[in-house]
């Protein structure tokens, strides 16, 4: 895929993004994000924000777009394009959003934000008030024989997370100004995604899709943690981020894929270097890495994937080191009256192609929504750590060689409850606590049982039917 002219991709996507921004500048009047059957007269009447003339003027293709908001098949789930990159979640997974029609365009808006205070024990722990957040405008329409989707994703974390980090005990793999970030997670870039997607149906059960992104998420790993339904109530990152989904913000991404019934195969080319510490700009780089992903969706409530990638020079501190990454995940979602239960299991492995050293991570997370306004969740992790943690936030010594050291465990449990809402914005107050299991080599630094506590306010864009 490296033969595709990089400059042309950038120009095309910038034009697409500008068009999407202009369209999304119109004031939306939200409609239901989950119509049961957009083709029925009853369902048409149940879509607020759309006039009778709008509904009667909708063609079959536009009605199909409406049906994709409540997908019944893997093909519809893919064309929904509500997760990160081109990843898929179970068909039954809820997707809070605002949505409206503007001429031939369906306009959507997703957003999730936390304002939280975190406090951690141990001499390496930290205390901080900060905000993690993202928002995603989308526009879809029929174009030629297929469907065009324009999508942007943005974060204000460069402003709401100061000093290049927020406290996260045992986190590693991050870098700022030539120094490792130890026990902290860096903010996301302001530009998380600028992408155009095009899908073509080839018969009733087959779909061809393409994805072009100045900044985006290649076909590697599960849905990235900020956008994963099972992690939606958890305000902080995962310890296994660099083994599982750290490529979710990559530069110059090109993905092609084919779906047949319940099976999908994809391949991506992208620039392997992770974003630098300059969080407001758009990084550049040639396509030098590749990945492939197999997705299987054996029913409404299940989704699984296996993926493999070769990544060129991802880490700024080790520019001569290329990496191999493998991930596998299984996601389950079960809707029920006044609630929903969603769970994800993830395995990730990163192997250095210089010395064949490996780091594995394992994650199990689950979120239960019950009695409409209540959420309880857990995240259990077992993550490999390297000797870089022993150095802390200091320049690496001359001749330093990174090597696997031990595993750490993180056990997180949380609860929040939604309270009075203003139109199209759900608010919740919550807290979570994390207890850590520490490998013997790290106990002299961290102690044997450090803990962390977070108290937060969560804000989310919703339609009235998401309540």
Tell what function each PLM region has:
Residues 105, 127-135, 188-194, 248-254, ...:
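Residues that define the transmembrane beta-barrel architecture of outer-membrane proteins
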Residues 107, 144-149, 204-208, 262-266, ...:
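Repeated loop/turn-to-beta-strand initiation elements of outer-membrane beta-barrel proteins
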Residues 109-111, 150-152, 210-212, 256, ...:
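Membrane-embedded beta-strand positions of outer-membrane beta-barrel proteins
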Residues 113-119, 154-160, 214-218, 260-262, ...:
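Transmembrane beta-strands of outer-membrane beta-barrel pores
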Residues 139-143, 200, 257-260, 296-298, ...:
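Residue-level signature of outer-membrane beta-barrel architecture
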Residues 161-295:
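Surface-exposed coil loops of outer-membrane beta-barrel proteins
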Residues 260, 264-268, 295-400, 411:
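Detector for outer-membrane/organellar transmembrane beta-barrel domains
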Residues 413, 447-467:
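Outer-membrane beta-barrel "beta-signal"
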